[in-house]
Amino acid sequence: MCDFTEDQTAEFKEAFQLFDRTGDGKILYSQCGDVMRALGQNPTNAEVLKVLGNPKSDEMNVKVLDFEHFLPMLQTVAKNKDQGTYEDYVEGLRVFDKEGNGTVMGAEIRHVLVTLGEKMTEEEVEMLVAGHEDSNGCINYEAFVRHILSG
């Protein structure tokens, strides 16, 4: 069922164990998406919930899973090719480039990230845009997307 190599699986298990706060070889359901993202995947919150079997929100910080159950979920997410590409993200941000100079206002990016789609918190957005704004409050969106996709 699993298409990962032995080396990949060992690397994934090592990362999984970093999220194991109690040392029992398990992580909380609420950590599953973070582990997947740490391993280079980019699932939406909805995708994570789907592979977890759509648990109730109050179960997310109670239910746990071990690596043997996590790995097939990671495989499912890795096979999903509906993830956006560099070009997709740049094209999406180009809509906000009113002057056609390759930059967008940082305030606009902040607004979009906290209000649309999978909403981020203001703290998450600040961490994401930190160091990308120029003296005019503009962000070069191509460099911004490259930075985000590079992990």
From Swiss-Prot:
N-acetylcysteine modified-residue sites: 2
EF-hand domain mapped to chain residues: 7-42, 84-119, 119-151
PROSITE patterns per the UniProt record, alphabetical: EF_HAND_2
GO biological process: muscle contraction; muscle filament sliding; skeletal muscle tissue development
Annotated positions of the N6-acetyllysine modification: 81
Any one GO molecular-function label of the UniProt entry: microfilament motor activity
Phosphoserine: modified positions: 57
SMART domains: EFh
InterPro entries to which the protein is assigned, alphabetical: CALM/Myosin/TropC-like, EF-hand-dom_pair, EF_hand_dom
SUBUNIT field: Myosin is a hexamer of 2 heavy chains and 4 light chains. Interacts with SPATA6.
PANTHER family registered for this protein in UniProt: MYOSIN LIGHT CHAIN 1, 3, MYOSIN LIGHT POLYPEPTIDE 6
Function: Regulatory light chain of myosin. Does not bind calcium.
Protein name in UniProt: Myosin light polypeptide 6
Gene that encodes it: MYL6
